[in-house]
């Protein structure tokens, strides 16, 4: 029997623990075929066996799957709602110590944005941000904390001036902000979720999952959150069956556990 996409999915799952069956089939298959051809392979079997032997090729594949589009203060109006509405709500609800989870954090732009905004209202030693991603490469970039000017273009100047040092052709985030963020490898579709979380930020990620996988992620987020905790989702997303999954909308892109 010919080696096909079904075989490829099984082998990728065994090798990486990434279950491609939980992603939208047509969309993901098309993306992988495009990458495969660009890398010079004509079929799934040759591509998989090449990845088994070449760690760099494999990491490139994982990075491509996770679709790492990230920048500081992306979608500014959402961050304004976060600062002006959600931070006071969190402070009233939980006091001065917060546990935040930035899920699928990519290169760290998002968890560092969160931390800088929280630092305007909380002591740094009261802020704990868990930041997770499936991709080792982007986690390495996040831990280093060095960014190009382009990725910082939307960040308010006051935050750039206060929390970054200009170095060469980029900017280094300061150690006091870095110390608040705990970067970890984590697969949203497979791994155990952290608990005792006051707010989860997961933006523009689950749009690539099947409806069943998406709902399961939202259920697990709900179990991770403390009572009345907040889920912050992306500009392209909406939780259709929010009440069934244990949420109510509090603002555009913000949902509260009920």
Predicted regions and their residues:
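Conserved AdoMet
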Residues: 2-98, 218, 234
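Residue-level signal for inorganic ion chemistry
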Residues: 82, 200, 225
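Conserved class I S-adenosyl-L-methionine
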Residues: 95-108, 128-130
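Conserved SAM-binding loop of SAM-dependent methyltransferases across substrates and taxa
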Residues: 107-122
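Extended basic-aromatic, gly/pro-enriched interface segments that bind polyanionic ligands
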Residues: 126-201, 205-213, 238-240, 258
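A short glycine-rich, Lys/Arg-flanked "PGG" loop and its adjoining helix->strand segment in the class I
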Residues: 215-227
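Conserved beta-strand signature within the Rossmann-like core of class I S-adenosyl-L-methionine
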Residues: 228-235
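Short hydrophobic/aromatic beta-strand or adjacent loop that forms the aromatic wall/cage
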Residues: 250-254
């Amino acid at each position: 029997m010919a080696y096909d996409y079904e075989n490829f999915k099984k082998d990728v799952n065994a090798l990486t623990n990434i279950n491609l069956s939980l992603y939208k089939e047509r969309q993901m298959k098309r993306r992988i075929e495009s990458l495969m051809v660009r890398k010079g392979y004509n079929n799934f079997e040759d591509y998989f066996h090449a990845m088994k032997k070449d760690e760099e090729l494999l990491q490139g594949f994982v990075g491509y799957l996770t679709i790492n589009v990230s920048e500081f203060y992306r979608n500014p109006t959402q961050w304004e709602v976060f600062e002006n509405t959600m931070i006071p709500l969190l402070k009233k609800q939980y006091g001065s110590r917060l546990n935040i989870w930035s899920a699928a954090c990519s290169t760290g732009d998002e968890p560092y944005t969160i931390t800088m905004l929280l630092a305007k209202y909380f002591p740094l030693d009261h802020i704990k941000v868990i930041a997770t991603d499936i991709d080792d490469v982007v986690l390495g970039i996040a831990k280093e904390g060095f960014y190009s000017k382009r990725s910082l273009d939307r960040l308010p100047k006051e935050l750039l001036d206060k929390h970054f040092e200009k170095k060469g052709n980029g900017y280094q985030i300061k150690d006091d902000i870095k110390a608040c963020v705990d970067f970890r490898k984590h697969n949203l579709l497979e791994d155990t979720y952290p608990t005792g979380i006051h707010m989860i930020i997961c933006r523009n990620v689950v749009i690539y999952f099947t409806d069943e996988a998406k709902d399961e992620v939202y259920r697990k987020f709900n179990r991770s959150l403390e009572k009345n905790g907040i889920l912050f989702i992306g500009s392209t997303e909406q939780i259709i069956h929010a009440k069934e999954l244990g949420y109510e909308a509090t603002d555009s892109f913000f949902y509260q556990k009920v």
